Every structure is written in structure tokens, then in C-alpha cells.
Amino acid sequence: MTRFSFKIHATDGKARTGAIQMMRGEIRTPAFMPVGTAATVKAMKVEDVRASGADIILGNTYHLMLRPGAERVARLGGLHKFMGWDRPILTDSGGYQVMSLSDLRKITEEGVTFASHLDGSRHLLSPERSMEIQRLLGSDIVMCFDECPRADQPREVIARSMEMSMRWARRSRDAFDAGGEHAERSALFGIQQGALDEGLRKTSADALTDIGFDGYAIGGLAVGEGQEAMFATLDFAPQQLPADRPRYLMGVGKPDDLVGAVERGVDMFDCVLPTRSGRNGQAFTWNGPLNMRNARHAEDTGPLDERCPCPTCTKYSRAYLHHLHKSGEMLGAMLLTEHNLWFYQQLMAGMRAAIAEGRFAAFAADFRRDYFAR
């Protein structure tokens, strides 16, 4: 079986469609990865996540290292066996969550010392420890350890942060390669940094390319800069990365973010939005998002989305979903989460088909017309 390969099947402008082959299966691109923070995609069984069309899910190093602990997961047979998911898993490095603990962490060249949000216990997360945790979890796609600075900081601060992330990338590469059997069946992605600065992004991309990775992530976006600034950065950042490797935009995003990023050459995405929104009563549809707590749905016997074939849309009315969310019933969160994941996977499938058929521009225009019609 192939450890890791990426083949581009078709392009349309900057948009690409293809497939990643790994030992645990194929990942069709552009791909959206549901987020399974604590070894679960919230409110979903793994078989239902797969039924939605997901080829790969994301696990969170920070949360899993604290509870139940990477060593315990390893003793229990690894993350796949632990949660019952037999397809590829990408794990983040833990860096983003640790950096967000601004009052509870200290950054040095060695790594980041932080206090657990659970019990206050002290931990050091370094490139080497991050690689060890992801190996213990049994991740298929491992992410380098990096720092994600705020985009509104001075250029010299962002430059110093990026340069340290590149040194950490080298250490991540070395530690990953020393991982024995796990390194022989998994892949390692580097993470480009540099905030919104084209020159810093180019320096970062060149440093990562010199080290060499199976894929490349675009980090440091979707952290409050806004869609306009994000798209302006994506006008150049993906093209700075190797064209023959997958490009992964971390933490993105809203449906229109995904379309705009694919338009600019991105292949992979993850975001908590479809699951978190589902728990909070928001449904994504081809005609824009719906707030199912709104009284206008109270007697609506129609489905969430007439174009959606998901179990929620084929079995339940808007009125029933409104009732569940107004009543605080957990089934409401489950049904909207299931629908949202189906919607995201249908969006990705639609983009893949449109790119393959050379009609992506028309697909994107039609999507925006309908999605923003309200």
C-alpha cells in the first residue's frame, strides 16, 4: 500500500481536484475534514460521519494529550481503534490551542510551557513532544509544531515568530523521521506562517520546501483578520507552495470561505463550524444559513433544504427541528450537525465535479447567487 501520494486529476484556473492515497484509504480533494476534537466529532457516530461523505477527520493533540492522554490512547490500540474510525486521521500539532492560552503559557526556543485548562498542571509542548504525541495517537497525517501569531502584531514580531516556526519545522521533521514504523506509514505536513505579509510568506514557503514535506498547510489565517484580508493573502500564499503537494488551509471555514479558497488553489480544510453551528441551532443550506430557533419555522412542514439528501432533510420538518431546539432536546443538535456535515461534503463534491468538468467559475457564481440571495 502507498504511504502517501497526491495526484491532481484536473485543474480549472487555480482550482484543483485530485486524490491523496494513504494506507487507510483515499482522500478526495478538495476535502473538508470534520473536527473530532476529543476523539469524537461532536454529536455524531463515526459511521454517520462517514455516511456524510467524509474521507478523513481531524483529531486535536492538545485536548487528547490532556485527556485521556496520548500514552493511554496508545495502550488502548491508537486513536483509530479508540474511536472506531478506520479511515485517515489528521492531527494538529497542539500549537494553536497552546498559543491561545495567552495568560497560561510561556514561549521559548525549546517550546511552549503551559498550564492545563483542566486542572492547572504544567506541561511542555515542543516539536519533539508534539511528534511523540501524534505518533502515540497513530495519526496518518502529522502536523509540524508551530507558533501562530496574531496578524495585527508588528512585522518584526511576526518575522521572528515565523523564523522560530521554521526552526521548529526542522526539529519536527527530524523527530518525525526518528519515529520508526509510524514514520513509514504516515505523512508529515509543514505549516507556512507570515500572517498577511507576502514576503514573509515566501520566506516561510522556501524554508519549508528546503526541509521537504508531504504536504503544506497555510497557517495563521482565519484568526480575526476578516475574509477580505484572508482572500488577499490566499491570492499569493498557495502559489508559493509546491504545486505537486496538497495545500491545506487550517481552521477554515464558512461555506463561502471554502469556495473562495478552492478558487485560489487550496485542497484541504477543517473547521468546527458545521458541528458547533448545528449544536447552536444553525443549519447551512444552499440558500444560506438558517436559525432554527426562529419562530418563522414553528409551523413549516418543509425540509431544511429541498436539495439535500441527508437523513435529517428526508425525514424531519423545519417545524420539528425548531421544536427540538426550542425545547433544548439533544436530538436537535444531532440532526442539525448531521445535516451540516452532509451539506459541507456535498459542497466539496460539487466543487470537485465542477473542476473536473471545467465549469468551476459557473459553479462558484451560482453558489454565491443562491447562498447570499436572502
From Swiss-Prot:
Keyword hit for Phosphoprotein: no
GO biological process: queuosine biosynthetic process; tRNA wobble guanine modification; tRNA-guanine transglycosylation
Keyword Nucleotidyltransferase recorded: no
Known pathway: tRNA modification; tRNA-queuosine biosynthesis
Cofactor binding mode and count: Binds 1 zinc ion per subunit.
Residues that bind Zn(2+): 308, 310, 313, 339
Assembly with partners or alone: Homodimer. Within each dimer, one monomer is responsible for RNA recognition and catalysis, while the other monomer binds to the replacement base PreQ1.
Protein's name according to its UniProt entry: Queuine tRNA-ribosyltransferase
Organism: Novosphingobium aromaticivorans (strain ATCC 700278 / DSM 12444 / CCUG 56034 / CIP 105152 / NBRC 16084 / F199)
Gene that this polypeptide is encoded by: tgt
